[in-house]
Every structure is written in structure tokens, then in C-alpha cells.
């Protein structure tokens, strides 16, 4: 029997040295700062993975990760330890700003140019509630203002499991609690067991793609009119946040916006002008 376990504890215990090594792996590959205070959470979330893979302890698992040449194992790791708590119309002030400020400006710009496409990136999209909310807002805006333009919403995440959930677009009732009833009826189909599925009219507006925000460059040939990266950078240290903000800046069009989580800040970036809490504009 593994000495790191007892009959009352189904989790595999992680030592201080093992925890330190695992924290380093997560930071180097994903930019996420795991705290040593997360020890119990890590044990509870990873123990089942270790058992399925046949590892007797965390040292064996970490040795395997360090020697691994592929990224499938790393994706499995981040899938297990990531917290994916989100819902439709989360931090609604951003969507008010989108409807009242950003979309009118984009409409004016489109009407005065040959380019009729709006490009929006939901970075760290988790299970899809954010990009689908954006799609709803755009559909409603175009219908209300009797305008029509091409819309491309790119939604990316490092986690394969949440991307699969996002593509399926099925959510329990607590995820749509902030959704007005008329939007619920218009854009969701009610399923059994109090679950709801996003209709195809929204699904076809959103393209989901796996992407690591720590990649040196992003595989995009065109810039964006708006980037959402909300409640993602809270896991990063200041250096990583600043590096990511600089990368976002390089993929934004002039006079476009970056929206981050309301508990997050970007400091010392001369290219991004602070507009209001969690809202920045590229000069």
C-alpha cells in the first residue's frame, strides 16, 4: 500500500518538494501562479488522474511531465486544476459598454469604409458563456438598429474539455440566471433536466479554438476590433500580465478596446489607455 495514503484518505498526498516542482511546471507552461495554499485542492483534483495513469505518487507523475515531449499530458493537468466558474452576462457593465459605446462606433466606422467585418476575440473563453453572450448582443444590436455586417467571434481556451463543452452549448439553469427571459426564449432551446442549449443561429457566429496565451506569437493574420480577456489574468503575476497585455495590444486595431476582469488591472502600459474599471483602449 502506498505510504502516502491511508484507508481514510482517497487522495494521494503531495510533499512540499513535489508541490514546488508542480507549481514551476504550471507557471512555465501556462503563466499561472499556483499558491502553496492550493495544496489540498491539487491533491483532490489530481489524485484520480494519477491513479488512472498508474502513478504511485506525485514524484512519478512530475518526472513523467518533465520528460514528456508532447503537450497532451500538460493539457490534462491544466484541465484538472483550472477553475471554470462563469455564466451568461457576467460583469454586465462590459456588455452595456459594448452596446452603448463600442458597437455604435464600430457601426459608424464600417459604414464609412469598405470593410464590413467586426472581429472579436474572447480569450480564455472557458465553457462558452462569454462568447455566446457577445453573439447575442451583436444579433440584438443589428436587429434593433437595422444594420447588418459580418461578425467573427473567436473564442479560445487552453482546456480541451471546456472547449468541447462550449461547442456543445448546453448549460444548467444557474448559468443563465442573468439572461433576460426574452433572450432565453429567442436564443436557447430548453432540454430535459432544466438544461438549455444554444441555438445554431448563435453557434455559427462563434469559432472555438485551443490556444495557450503563453505562446510567443498568436496565429492570427488580422487584428481585432475588441478583445475580452476577463478573469484570466488574475492567475498571473504582474510580469506575465504585462507581457500578455503587450501581445493583446499588437493584435488590436487602432482605437479598439481590451476588456479584462473587474478584479484585474494593467499597470504601466503606455499603449493602452485606461477608460474605466477593467476597460482599456488602444491609442
Swiss-Prot record:
Pfam families cross-referenced by the UniProt entry: CheR, CheR_N
Residues of the CheR-type methyltransferase domain: 7-283
Annotated keywords: Chemotaxis, Methyltransferase, S-adenosyl-L-methionine, Transferase
Enzyme kind, highest EC tier: transferase
Molecular-function GO term, any one: protein-glutamate O-methyltransferase activity
Catalytic reactions on record: L-glutamyl-[protein] + S-adenosyl-L-methionine = [protein]-L-glutamate 5-O-methyl ester + S-adenosyl-L-homocysteine
Single biological process term from Gene Ontology: chemotaxis
Sequence positions that bind S-adenosyl-L-methionine: 84, 86, 90, 130, 157, 212-213, 230-231
PROSITE patterns recorded: CHER
E.C. number: 2.1.1.80
PANTHER family for this protein: CHEMOTAXIS PROTEIN METHYLTRANSFERASE
Function: Methylation of the membrane-bound methyl-accepting chemotaxis proteins (MCP) to form gamma-glutamyl methyl ester residues in MCP.
Protein name as it appears in the record: Chemotaxis protein methyltransferase
Source organism of this protein record: Borreliella burgdorferi (strain ATCC 35210 / DSM 4680 / CIP 102532 / B31)
Name of the encoding gene: cheR
